[in-house]
Swiss-Prot record:
Record-annotated membrane-spanning stretches: 15-35, 53-73, 136-156
Record carries keyword Transmembrane: yes
NCBIfam families: HI0507
Locations listed in the record: Cell membrane
Stated name of the protein: UPF0114 protein PputW619_4503
Originating species: Pseudomonas putida (strain W619)
Organism placement in taxonomy: Bacteria, Pseudomonadati, Pseudomonadota, Gammaproteobacteria, Pseudomonadales
Entry keywords, A to Z: Cell membrane, Membrane, Transmembrane, Transmembrane helix
Bilayer topology: Multi-pass membrane protein
Length: 162
């Protein structure tokens, strides 16, 4: 009975595979939205103010960071919790494949969240004259919460590894 239960629990990790595949569909949706934004802005690039162009570029950078986060979570999560990727040696291989454990994945996710939050905060500050002080204050508080959380996670990770 114990063996059957253990084998069933171990096999249940494959339930994560469609979830990680779903993230790839999310990445596809993000790529479509990225190029929709590029196609939308290119014909109007000369009519945009410098501030508006910077906001569009920040939005594109934000999408690229989210895309990188999706790839990292999708591939590392699959490798850590489901199965190793069998990538042919003749194909291009990411140098971090097989090297990122769940702890380093958490740190990279935390750093990505801080970077994404920073871009959002910069976008808010670029339009600060149209935004209430309370909204700005809460945005900074939330961002600092992400920063402090990432710092604490890194510190705890360093302390537990030594």
């Amino acid at each position: 009975m114990e063996r059957i239960l253990e084998n069933a629990m171990y096999a249940s990790r494959w339930l994560l595979a469609p979830i990680y595949f779903g993230l790839s569909l999310g990445l596809l949706a993000l790529a479509l939205k990225f190029f929709q934004e590029v196609i939308h802005v290119l014909p109007n690039v000369f009519a945009l103010s410098e501030a508006d162009l910077i906001l569009v570029i920040l939005s594109l950078i934000d999408m690229s960071l989210v895309g990188g986060l999706l790839v990292m979570v999708m591939i590392s999560g699959y490798e850590n919790f489901v199965s190793q990727l069998d990538i042919d040696d003749s194909k291009e291989k990411l140098n971090w494949l097989g090297k990122m454990d769940s702890s380093s994945l958490k740190m990279k996710v935390a750093a990505s969240i801080v970077a994404i939050s920073s871009i959002h905060l910069l976008r808010v500050f670029m339009d600060a004259q149209n935004i209430s002080t309370d909204y700005l204050m809460w945005y900074v508080i939330i961002h600092m919460t992400f920063v402090v959380s990432a710092f604490c996670m890194g510190y705890l990770d360093k302390v537990t590894k030594h």
